[in-house]
């Protein structure tokens, strides 16, 4: 068994788990050791929230889904939050991983649609003609130029953030707006949220949304 490859620490709401993927040969080896390590105190994890910090670039969508399946079905946890080790160091877009989060590491092209009841994080661009629907937040580590709807289940606290925020249609809960066709295009990350019943767009300040 790989020593110190998985560190488990308790908190008020559940567990903080730090996984060093550099110490594993592959995902399957990591998952086997993870299950063995947590099985010792399995009964204590029911209904808790688990925060997993690791090198998310080492995971594909299928592996993230399998990981979530193990946590929710085998350990009966209430919530799972994935954090990238780089994000915790750089404080970029932290504070948005609240609740179940789905990661997509690809560019979304015209005609493609993503729909997920939790948060969506896209590492890539969202091209014109594509659509993104999330019950929670939508975060794009790239250019957002397609249609995007956060808080689709009515969550007015949801946010939409991107390195370049220029969607054709932007909607949070039941409030919709369109990006202006003219005007300067900011070179910094922006976040859209609801304030006083309207959608506002402002520079992304990490400490404000942590």
UniProtKB/Swiss-Prot annotation:
Name listed for the protein in its UniProt record: Probable septum site-determining protein MinC
HAMAP family: MinC
GO biological process: cell morphogenesis; division septum assembly; regulation of cell septum assembly
PANTHER family, per database record: SEPTUM SITE-DETERMINING PROTEIN MINC
Organism encoding this protein: Clostridium novyi (strain NT)
Assembly mode: Interacts with MinD and FtsZ.
Physiological role: Cell division inhibitor that blocks the formation of polar Z ring septums. Rapidly oscillates between the poles of the cell to destabilize FtsZ filaments that have formed before they mature into polar Z rings. Prevents FtsZ polymerization.
The entry's keywords: Cell cycle, Cell division, Septation
Gene behind this protein: minC
């Amino acid at each position: 068994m790989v020593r110190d490859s998985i560190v488990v620490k308790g908190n008020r709401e559940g567990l903080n788990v730090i996984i060093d993927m550099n110490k594993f040969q592959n995902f399957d080896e990591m998952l086997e050791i993870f299950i063995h390590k947590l099985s010792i105190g399995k009964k204590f994890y029911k209904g808790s929230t688990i925060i997993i910090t690791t090198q998310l670039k080492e995971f594909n969508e299928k592996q993230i889904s399998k990981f979530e399946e193990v946590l929710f079905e085998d350990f009966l946890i209430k919530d799972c939050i994935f954090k990238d080790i780089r994000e915790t160091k750089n404080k970029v877009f932290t504070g948005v991983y609240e609740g179940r989060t789905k990661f997509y590491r690809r560019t979304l092209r015209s005609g493609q649609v993503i729909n997920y009841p939790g948060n969506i994080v896209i590492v890539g661009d969202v091209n014109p003609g594509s659509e993104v629907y999330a019950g929670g937040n939508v975060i794009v580590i790239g250019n957002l130029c397609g249609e995007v709807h956060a808080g689709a289940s009515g969550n007015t606290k949801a946010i939409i953030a991107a390195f370049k925020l220029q969607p054709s249609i932007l909607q949070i809960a039941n409030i919709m707006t369109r990006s202006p066709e003219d005007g300067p295009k900011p070179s910094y990350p922006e976040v859209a949220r609801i304030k006083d019943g309207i959608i506002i767009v402002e520079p992304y300040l990490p400490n404000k949304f942590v």
